[in-house]
Amino acid sequence: MTAPWADWDHVLKIDPDKSLVDGETFDDIAQTGTDAIEIGGTLDVTTEKMRRVIDACRTHEVPLYQEPSNPAVVVEDEALDGYLVPVVLNAGDPFWITGAHKEWVRIADLDWERTTTEAYIVMNPDASVAEYTGADCGLDADEVGAYATVAERLLGQEVVYVEYSGTLGDPAVVEAAAGGVDDAAVFYGGGIDGYDAAYRMGAHADTIVVGDLVHEAGVDAVRETVSGVRDAQAEE
């Protein structure tokens, strides 16, 4: 069966701890052209905040996923198409490689059919997720490519996520990740602030993830990133 993200060029990540731009709604977000909406954040995330976003998005046809930062904020809701659970391969703290996941699998009636792990490679040392997980961000492109191969070949991961949260990354690093896998999808996130950045990273990643932009600049800016990645993918 083909994975849903096989057809995704663009994912919009909503941080439940952040507000939308004044005057904009989740109805507007659903009309940006994004392929999926992912709800997740690193700091100050609660189930109540998660539910608020889920409730606001439940009536739209855009696929809706939760990316919980820890098992305590998992929300069971039929409006969700699934759960994307990060495994931080370069975490300094093993809790973020298997420890949190040990707790995850103890959730009663865990819906395995809708649960997928994402093999994160965190690359921005100043990002909250890097500090939170103690990630070794001093990796070169070859090392990132090797981590991507580990993710797919040794760990059976379907998604490799190169995360530069808060800053635009090195396209050569994303290209190396793509070169390290055969079938796994390569996601890229971080610093996508407009058409050019989306085009640049979309030339190497299968899917770009846009987050802060929707909270800081709004839906028109998000639409530009959708156009950028689609144009890049069309040229491949």
From Swiss-Prot:
InterPro entries (alphabetical): GGGP/HepGP_synthase_I (IPR039074), GGGP/HepGP_synthase_sf (IPR038597), GGGP_HepGP_synthase (IPR008205), GGGPS_halobacteria (IPR026417)
Pfam (any one): PcrB
Binding residues annotated for sn-glycerol 1-phosphate, in chain numbering: K13, Y161, V162, E163, Y164, S165, G166, G191, G211, D212
Family: Belongs to the GGGP/HepGP synthase family. Group I subfamily.
Keyword list, A-Z: Cytoplasm, Lipid biosynthesis, Lipid metabolism, Magnesium, Metal-binding, Phospholipid biosynthesis, Phospholipid metabolism, Transferase
One GO BP: glycerophospholipid biosynthetic process
EC primary class: transferase
Binding site for Mg(2+): D15, T42
UniProt keyword annotation of Transferase present: yes
PANTHER family documented for this protein: HEPTAPRENYLGLYCERYL PHOSPHATE SYNTHASE (PTHR40029:SF2), PTHR40029
Its EC number(s): 2.5.1.41
GO molecular function, one term: magnesium ion binding
Main localisation: cytoplasm
A single cellular component GO annotation: cytoplasm
Listed SUPFAM superfamilies: FMN-linked oxidoreductases
Pathway noted in the entry: Membrane lipid metabolism; glycerophospholipid metabolism
Function text: Prenyltransferase that catalyzes the transfer of the geranylgeranyl moiety of geranylgeranyl diphosphate (GGPP) to the C3 hydroxyl of sn-glycerol-1-phosphate (G1P). This reaction is the first ether-bond-formation step in the biosynthesis of archaeal membrane lipids. Cannot use sn-glycerol-3-phosphate (G3P), glycerol or dihydroxyacetonephosphate (DHAP) as substrate.
Catalytic activity line of the entry: sn-glycerol 1-phosphate + (2E,6E,10E)-geranylgeranyl diphosphate = sn-3-O-(geranylgeranyl)glycerol 1-phosphate + diphosphate
Cofactor(s) of this protein: Mg(2+)
SUBUNIT field: Monomer.
Protein known as: Geranylgeranylglyceryl phosphate synthase
Entry's localization field: Cytoplasm
Keyword Metal-binding: yes
